[in-house]
Amino acid sequence: MLVYQKTKAEFLDDVLSNQVEVIIQDLVLKKLGRKTGQSEINSWRNSMMYMNNVLVDTHIPSDSGVSIEYQLPYAGLRIDFVLTGQDEQGADKAIIIELKQWSEAAATDKDGVVSTYLGKGLQEVNHPSYQAWSYAAYLNGFNETVYTDGIKLLPCAYLHNHPDNGVLTSGHYADYVAKAPLFLKSDALKLREFIRQHVRHGDKSGIMYRIDGGRIRPSKQLADSLASMMKGNQEFILLDE
C-alpha cells in the first residue's frame, strides 16, 4: 500500500517546511490506521533531512517519484524510501533505500546478520543490505507488474550516522553488499551518484502506482527457485524488519 507518494520537488518542499515527519505521521494514521511512537517520528525527521541533502541536485529530476513507508503486500513489512524514474534509455527504475539511524554495529558469525543497539539493548538483526535486497527479491518474485513490465528494482541501504569502520562492509557480508550497495555516513555523494546513474528522467509512468496495483502471483523464476530448493539447493530468502 502506498502511504506517502509525491514528486521529488514536493518531498523537498515538505522537508523545507520542517513538517515532513508530521505529514508522514498523518498519512500513516489515515491510510494504515496506525498511531506512531515518538522514536519513529524522530527517525523520519532525521532520515528525511539526510535524504533531502542527497536529492538536492539538479541532475536528479524534480518529477522523479518519492515513496515513503511503502507497505509490501501480504508481507507485513514496509520499505523506508523508494525513488522512481526512467534511465537514459527510458526503462523504468525503482531505487529501494533502506534507512538506518545506527551509529554502530557489530558483526556476527551468522549469515547476513549483525548486532546493534535497538530499544532496550543489543539485538541481532538482518544486515541492511540483506534487508533491502530481500524486499526487492520479494517484489521481483511475487509482483506481476514488476516482472512482466520489466521494472528494474535497485536495492541499497543508507546508514547516515554510521562511520565507515569496515564492520558492515567486511568480506563476511560482501555478497549482500554486492546485491544492495551500502552507503555510510561519509557516502552521501556516492549515494547521489548512484541515483544519478539510474534515474536520469522523471517518473512518467506512475511506477509505484503500477507496482501497488500489481497482482500478487509467483513468477516463473520464483517457481523454478522453489523447485530447485525442494531438490536441496539453498535459494530461500528470509524477510524480516
Which residues make up each language-model segment?
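Accessory nucleic-acid engagement/destabilization modules that flank
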Residues: M1-G213
